[in-house]
Every structure is written in structure tokens, then in C-alpha cells.
């Protein structure tokens, strides 16, 4: 029987997002969520952790693409990774995900990510795993940094690359990413499969199966966000009954 983790991204993004995540927790529709350090309702995310950490997992949602950074770097401003908008410095990492950056730029980015993590940990959160906003933990410049971050934070579990697809070149390339990370830190654990909730739901409904019977599958969702159709499916579906699986969290992986 497959094991499924349903992770709600963006905990802390806003009061609306947090309220929808809390509803999904209470209805047992998700088993995990990941916290952002620099968005509008960080305090609400910490409240959710304190109230629900006994039965779902809480990870670190590193953010390099939205909101204000927690550190200052003139180099990242000059590069454009940090950007000034209407007198406010904001994160702008998305255009750089496939670029090779200088050592000093990577160090400045690492400092920002570490500061985000420590802000959450200093509020009493014990991370179950690491993922990221807009998949930035999969950026080229993060490949040498992610194993180091895992070691420094004492976290061994990381979201996999989106790999729910037929076997072929594209899937092989995505599998290579995980192998490159493991080469640098053999203790890192990934779920076998990662895909968004709605795509998995629709494939399953059509009998399209790309996973093995004993795989651990992470399904990503965004309660309170723009994906209202996906959220409706999530909130009206008993995962274990629908997908013939066991619902687990990252602490059980």
C-alpha cells in the first residue's frame, strides 16, 4: 500500500491562508505543512504549530521569491536577487534559478535562508523537513547549499523534484537532481514521488498510475490560495479511501 503525505504550502503567508490550512488540519485533509518566516501572518503559523504539532508535521518553507528579505545584502541588490520596489526591498530570486552565481552571492543567499530558518526555530518549531516557495530549493545554485543547510539545521528530509510522469529523459533528469544532493549528504531522505494534489487526483481518476505500490508520495496543496478547484477536491475527499493509501506525515517518513 502506498503512503501519502499531503503538505499544505505557505503556512504564515496570510491570515486567510492560515485559516484555510487550519480547517484542513481539523478535517484531517492534510498531514503536513511548511512555514514561511517573512510573510504577513508568521505569528499565526506559530500558533498553528503550537496547537497541532502533535499530529501533523511542520517543515521549513524557504522563500527567495516573495516578500521582504530578513537580511541585507548590497551584492544581492546589485545583482537583482533583492529588488527595490516602491522604496521597499523584496525577494526576486525566480529569474536566477538556472543561473550559476558567484561564491559571495551564494553565501549571501545562504545567510538569508538560514536567517529565515532560525527565526522559525527560535519560535520553538522543530522542523520535520525542508521545501521551498516556488521550488527554489531546486535551483542550480542550491545544489551545493542544500546538503549543508540540512546538516546545519539537523533536518534529514527534503521535498523531491516533481517527478510524477512516465519514465523518460525528463524524469531521468529530475531523478539526477536527488542523486546529486545525496552524493553530498547521504543522510538526506526524499519521498519517492512528488506532485501537486489536483494532478494526482485527476490521474488517479483516469486510472493513470506512475507510482509503485510501496512508494511514498507527497502531494502539494495550497489551501487559501488561488487554486480553489484543487482545494474543493482536497476538502471533499477522504484520501485513504479515495487513493487506497495510508496517510502519513513527514515525521513518519
Which sequence ranges carry the predicted segments?
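Terminal accessory/targeting
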Residues: 2-5, 15-124, 129, 137-253
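DG-centered beta-turn motif at the end of beta-strands
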Residues: 8-12
Amino acid at each position: 500500500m502506498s503512503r501519502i503525505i499531503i503538505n499544505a504550502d505557505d503556512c504564515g503567508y496570510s491570515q486567510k491562508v492560515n485559516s484555510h490550512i487550519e480547517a484542513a488540519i481539523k478535517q484531517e485533509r492534510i498531514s503536513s505543512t511548511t512555514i514561511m518566516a517573512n510573510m504577513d501572518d508568521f505569528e499565526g503559523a506559530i500558533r498553528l504549530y503550537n496547537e497541532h504539532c502533535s499530529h501533523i508535521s511542520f517543515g521549513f518553507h524557504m522563500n527567495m521569491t516573495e516578500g521582504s528579505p530578513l537580511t541585507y545584502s548590497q551584492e544581492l541588490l546589485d545583482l537583482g536577487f533583492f529588488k527595490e520596489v516602491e522604496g521597499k526591498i523584496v525577494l526576486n530570486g525566480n529569474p536566477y534559478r538556472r543561473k550559476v552565481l558567484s561564491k559571495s552571492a551564494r553565501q549571501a543567499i545562504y545567510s538569508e535562508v538560514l536567517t529565515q530558518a532560525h527565526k522559525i526555530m527560535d519560535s520553538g518549531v522543530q522542523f520535520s523537513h525542508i521545501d521551498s516557495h516556488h521550488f527554489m530549493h531546486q535551483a542550480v545554485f542550491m545544489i551545493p547549499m542544500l546538503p549543508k543547510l540540512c546538516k546545519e539545521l539537523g533536518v534529514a528530509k527534503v521535498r523531491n523534484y516533481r517527478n510524477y510522469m512516465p519514465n523518460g529523459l525528463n524524469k531521468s533528469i529530475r531523478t539526477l537532481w536527488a542523486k546529486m544532493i545525496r552524493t553530498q549528504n547521504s543522510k538526506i531522505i526524499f519521498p519517492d514521488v512528488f506532485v501537486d494534489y489536483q494532478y494526482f487526483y485527476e490521474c488517479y481518476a483516469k486510472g493513470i498510475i506512475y507510482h509503485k505500490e510501496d512508494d511514498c508520495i507527497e502531494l502539494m496543496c495550497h489551501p487559501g490560495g488561488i487554486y480553489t478547484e484543487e482545494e474543493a477536491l482536497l476538502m471533499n475527499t477522504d484520501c485513504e479511501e479515495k487513493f487506497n493509501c495510508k496517510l502519513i506525515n513527514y515525521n513518519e517518513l
